[in-house]
Amino acid sequence: MMNLEKNFDKTTLFNHMRTDKRGKCSDLNEYGTSCDKTTAVEYNKVHMAMTHYECNERGINFSRKSPLTQSQRTITGWSAFESNKCEENFSQSSAHIVHQKTQAGDKFGEHNECTDALYQKLDFTAHQRIHTDFTAHQKFYLSDEHGKCRKSFYWKAHLIQHERPHSGEKTYQYEECAKSFCSSSHPIQHPGTYVGFKLYECNECGKAFCQNSNLSKHLRIHTKEKPCDNNGCGRSYKSPLIGHQKTDAEMELCGGSEYGKTSHLKGHQRILMGEKPYECIECGKTFSKTSHLRAHQRIHTGEKPYECVECEKTFSHKTHLSVHQRVHTGEKPYECNDCGKSFTYNSALRAHQRIHTGEKPYECSDCEKTFAHNSALRAHHRIHTGEKPYECNECGRSFAHISVLKAHQRIHTREKPYECNECGRSFTYNSALRAHQRIHTGRKPYECSDCEKTFAHNSALKIHQRIHTGEKPYKCNECEKTFAHNSALRAHQNIHTGEKLYECSECGKTFFQKTRLSTHRRIHTGEKPYECSKCGKTFSQKSYLSGHERIHTGEKPYECNVCGKTFVYKAALIVHQRIHTGEKPYECNECGKTFSQRTHLCAHQRIHTGEKPYECNECGKTFADNSALRAHHRIHTGEKPYECNDCGKTFSKTSHLRAHLRTRSGEKPYECSECGKTFSEKSYVSAHQRVHTGEKPYECNVCGKPFAHNSTLRVHQRIHTGEKSYECNDCGKTFSQKSHLSAHQRIHTGEKPYECNECGKAFAQNSTLRVHQRIHTGEKPYECDECGKTFVRKAALRVHHTRMHTREKTLACNGFGKS
């Protein structure tokens, strides 16, 4: 703090004391001030805080009576002085006198250059200095503190006040909290901020303010007053008139009138000429005005000299402070001519007006999409760049938008501040609450302009419109595959990372997406919250309900552009299109086999894991697929829903019906690429091809014997279990295989359906016919490893081997071999 030696005579002391508006000076004892005895008594009233006058309303003490009187008038609103002409009231005599001079036209002086009228001598003297063209030696007070700015002042007091931010000096201290200030007005304004004491109250709404100027600004909200009228153009402004006049002021170069100041004229000329003589030594940026340079330099110094007296927030520019103060006053001076909505900032009004004009001036250089706001364009750019500058401190996840980060952080805090009035359900986001409330109202305000379909959410409409446009704005950085939905991209990216974030607590199954986990949990809980209004059937997922409702309406909105076939579900269309493209995007990690559907891959993988999660409630038998369980259930119920239109025969499985139809038609569309043999079913081809490859993927877990077919393995396993589940109704004999039972029943019926084409002989079993046909063909497929003799039947080979070679070996071992 600066040490100043001050010598006062009585008059100077009186003026010194008047600078302290509350009658109290802070931290002045260290100045070393000296005065005569009489003056010292008066001086001590100030510096020893001899406060004889106390305000009963506010509890504040004063050293003199006049500040107390003024304080009480402020609180009570009492005005002692009334104007004779306009009946305006004043609480101070000085203000009353000045007002009367204004009314009477009694001017202390009128300046020749600008005809401004001044009613007080002090004002007139100060005003003259504005017009006088002072030379360097006539500007008596020059700032040279630390060589900062060399700004000159007409008043020494202004110089001292100006130098304090350079020196860091804060001479005035508020004794309640020891906070120091550069200006004497700041500790006067500060107590109201410190104790929450706001003297100036609005009569309309009751809002209170620390400063009368802020109250005056606030009152304009109620009065709609725009006090500054410019005679030149007739427009009125809530902001100062001078600022507007600067924009209207013109000079000879641009066809207008002259400037009031030479410096203003020169500054304006630089703008027209593009001249920028003032350069920042930090970054080299140039400016046309020194004031602009000084304001810019605060970016480098971090200086924020303008402080809000309401909340103590600081700003680098005075204009920023002025705009900020509207937060406290509630002033919204910028009004929309179209809808009457008012705004705190002019920039906010301009942005709002684009709603009415439809203007979108900001265009994306990558995809040519346009936006109404520059901030929206910057946010959109991050889709193309992949930039996510906002990172969560809890989990490290990054986001493209700060609003999304803030919303995400509620996951960690578990905060759900938005509650539904109808059902009491709470939400993390306000948008989620609004969307939820449409469930209660049934409102769907968003309509597709192409197909007139309506949606409850705007986001759902935007996603839907991509069906018509074919737009896929989300691209994978790894494989460059594009997606219509961001969620689909995120799910896809987990294929590359292998990451599965969400785990089911019941069964441990993991999912890429939280929504998938929520849906999966309903398997365990049995919850089916979505009900069909037509038939009452319930579903675990909303998409299932939507698809089901199309059964009632007959709607099939998804059409194949290759063959014209239509589908109820889009997923069914996508799967169908793979028939035309031959695409099989799902590959088994164990054996490399590929599938066109994910469900087929999942079912296939259970072959390797042995998992059978679907259990029959009747017999306890387990299955790898839910469809297999449903088909099995029909054994217990006897249901055969699939009927042949030609012969009326019914089947429990649709695959059995298709196979039956091919038997009648003789169709065999599936051909083996190795030998050209054709089959009526695709599964038969797959099974047959194992003859060529020698593959036997099904292994018995008891004896380890491998099999080419799963059905063969199941039959084999009955040897170990002794199971014979197929019983003859005629004689009660049981069999391990259904085919054996069918063959046996022909003994009772005498049926011989298999006939030889060569000789017409008929047989009860197909295997017997095949053996018989070898008589005509001469085929003997079974060869003895010992002697090379061949046989028609496998049984004949076994008999030969036992009788001839096994007997010979036995005799040789006993010493009866050939000599």
Swiss-Prot record:
SUPFAM superfamilies assigned: beta-beta-alpha zinc fingers (SSF57667)
Localization of this protein: Nucleus
Positions annotated as zinc finger (C2H2-type): 141-166, 200-222, 278-300, 306-328, 334-356, 362-384, 390-412, 418-440, 446-468, 474-496, 502-524, 530-552, 558-580, 586-608, 614-636, 642-664, 670-692, 698-720, 726-748, 754-776, 782-805
Main location: nucleus
Positions of transmembrane segments: none
Top-level division of the source organism's lineage: Eukaryota
PANTHER family on file: C2H2-TYPE DOMAIN-CONTAINING PROTEIN, FINGER PUTATIVE TRANSCRIPTION FACTOR FAMILY-RELATED
Annotated family: Belongs to the krueppel C2H2-type zinc-finger protein family.
Its job: May be involved in transcriptional regulation.
Protein name per the record: Zinc finger protein 658B
